[in-house]
Amino acid sequence: MSAAISRNWPAPAKLNLFLHINGRRTDGYHELQTLFQFIDYCDMLDFKVTDSSELILHSNMAGVVADSDNLILRAAKSLQQMTSFKGGAEIWLDKRLPMGGGLGGGSSDAATTLVALNTLWNTQLSTAELAKIGLKLGADIPVFIHGFAAFAEGIGERLQVVSPPEPWYLVIAPDAHVSTAEVFQDPLLPRNTPKLAIDTLMSQAWINDCQKLVVSKYPQVAKALGWLLEYAPSRMTGTGACVFGEFTQQQQALAALAKLPSDMQGFVAKGMNISPLITRLNHP
């Protein structure tokens, strides 16, 4: 008898509420201080456990390649190898988040895959063990696995749970693909922001050290940010291209969205300090 499909596992987007670059390490990675918060805008994944060890991925979006390099498949394969689980899975991805926009969609998909399959395969790894697997696949995967808004240091792997305000956001996804690698390799990127204590960082104005460089190189990002700043305090998330504005009320964000120029794409979402993935995990 075939296993039932376990449905509606969310892979939420994240925002970097601030992003400071403190220096460059000898291995080429950058020392960061950043604040991660989730939003209730998610990719959705369904899983079916199979007797075969094969891993099969389906997606609603062209360009999400179902090959061995896909982060979802790499995450599932890593969990198989770590636990010696003999079965496999068929996975369906409903891709809703913009790709390569600084919202962490690929990392979130991988994290949800690890959390869901650890439950469905009954492999019983701890959250810390799952995060260790995730870190080998991407520096920001652990924050999605832990599922709490967090202040992050190092290359983003040292996490401290925090509870920033949970406003409404209008997120705009400019029609531009910003290469994270190119941003971090650019000689004009600021790399000397002083490290500060978390209490100091939480109480001062929040900025993104990548924003000025990206805005100067990508006119689509500059246009979106300039438009959004007319309505709310706004900045870029990650290395872009997505930008977000903060609103205290949902109707304020929706009113701004209604005025969005036709050549821009956007959505309204709520800030969340507890990931929808944690809620799904606790209510199977």
From Swiss-Prot:
Catalytic site: 14, 140
One of the record's GO molecular function terms: ATP binding
Organism superkingdom: Bacteria
Enzyme Commission number(s): 2.7.1.148
Gene3D superfamilies named among the record's database cross-references: 3.30.230.10, GHMP kinase, C-terminal domain
TM regions (residue ranges): none
Pathway field: Isoprenoid biosynthesis; isopentenyl diphosphate biosynthesis via DXP pathway; isopentenyl diphosphate from 1-deoxy-D-xylulose 5-phosphate: step 3/6
Chain residues that bind ATP: 98-108
SUPFAM superfamilies in the record: GHMP Kinase, C-terminal domain, Ribosomal protein S5 domain 2-like
Swiss-Prot/TrEMBL catalytic activity: 4-CDP-2-C-methyl-D-erythritol + ATP = 4-CDP-2-C-methyl-D-erythritol 2-phosphate + ADP + H(+)
One GO process term, biological-process aspect: isopentenyl diphosphate biosynthetic process, methylerythritol 4-phosphate pathway
Keywords: ATP-binding, Isoprene biosynthesis, Kinase, Nucleotide-binding, Transferase
Family: Belongs to the GHMP kinase family. IspE subfamily.
Function text: Catalyzes the phosphorylation of the position 2 hydroxy group of 4-diphosphocytidyl-2C-methyl-D-erythritol.
Stated name of the protein: 4-diphosphocytidyl-2-C-methyl-D-erythritol kinase
Species whose genome carries this gene: Shewanella putrefaciens (strain CN-32 / ATCC BAA-453)
